[in-house]
Amino acid sequence: LRYLQKHYWKTKYSFNFPRMRPSENGGFQPNVVMSDRELAQVTFATRIFDHDVDISYSTRESASFRDNMARLGVTTMSAESKTEPGGYYSYPQTLEQFHVSDERTAKEVTLALKNLGIEPVWKDWDQSFDAVNCQEHAATTTV
């Protein structure tokens, strides 16, 4: 990371530590499963290493774990994620790549963050996320 920051200093860097989960179709089973405690330790170590880097948590993590980590170093979270190919355009749900643990709607995630004293900021640089439709799509919330 330090090399990249030195040579590409105008770039913003981020980390995501998605835990490998068994696939819904049973094809993939992880050899090692990282505990909540271990993921928290990796998150804290990363935050100590670099206080400016973004740290993202996906909907693979449980709602309670994401809520608890929101004030402890995580900067972005997804909401209403679809994990199957074409999942935002094709229904019904087929070929899910992995299980989504946090199944809350974007509105529910927003409310949970507000209840923690965090002001959610929606991704606003893509035309598909306008103020009218932001709650109908998966979104990224900056915390």
What are these regions (language model features)?
Residues Y3:
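Conserved binding/catalytic microenvironments
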Residues K6-V143:
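Auxiliary Fe-S-binding modules of radical SAM enzymes
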